[in-house]
């Protein structure tokens, strides 16, 4: 399970663009907590503390417990808005969750055991299509990553989404469950050799057909 993050916050009564700019000048970030059948709550959080959390690499798929003036609220980050030039955080949306809440999150995928793949040993390249998997999972059971073994894969073999083992209680949120997650492709040199062999085979077949035709013409 991914780590739970803790963030201090204060309620905010001010709203609107002017109020948000004033909040940012104070070194704070305006944010909102919504969901779980409760009214939305406007808050402010410290920009530096939030920036550190963003740099953990798993902020968007972690439970963030927000302490709002002593009231601790478990949430999931749903959207982060950045300044287009400075990359400063402008606003954050947090979804309030409970122990039984089902959430949709993007989980990073780690592909392992490349040294056990015959195709990769022969020079094949692991072409990764899905670096993340979208899962529906309980908020209290969000995995930190999904580990996928490529052991035994030959050149041309693929792993599909529906072949990946998921944590108990989790399910894919992708529309196409049979789409390819990763495949072992032939390197350019191997492709060239295969093409050359195919061309040679075609040339030999054409030559043989021509010889047979000539023999047939002679016999006539």
Swiss-Prot record:
Family annotation (InterPro entries): Rbsml_bL25/Gln-tRNA_synth_N (IPR020056), Ribosomal_bL25/Gln-tRNA_synth (IPR011035), Ribosomal_bL25_b-dom (IPR020057), Ribosomal_bL25_C (IPR037121), Ribosomal_bL25_long (IPR001021), Ribosomal_L25_dom (IPR029751), Ribosomal_uL5_bac-type (IPR020930)
Single GO MF annotation: 5S rRNA binding
GO CC terms: cytosolic large ribosomal subunit
GO BP term (any one): translation
Record keyword Nucleotide-binding present: no
Protein keywords: Ribonucleoprotein, Ribosomal protein, RNA-binding, rRNA-binding
Function: This is one of the proteins that binds to the 5S RNA in the ribosome where it forms part of the central protuberance.
Family, as annotated: Belongs to the bacterial ribosomal protein bL25 family. CTC subfamily.
UniProt-listed PANTHER family: RIBOSOMAL PROTEIN L25/GLN-TRNA SYNTHETASE, ANTI-CODON-BINDING DOMAIN-CONTAINING PROTEIN, RIBOSOMAL PROTEIN L25_GLN-TRNA SYNTHETASE, ANTI-CODON-BINDING DOMAIN-CONTAINING PROTEIN
The name this protein goes by in its record: Large ribosomal subunit protein bL25
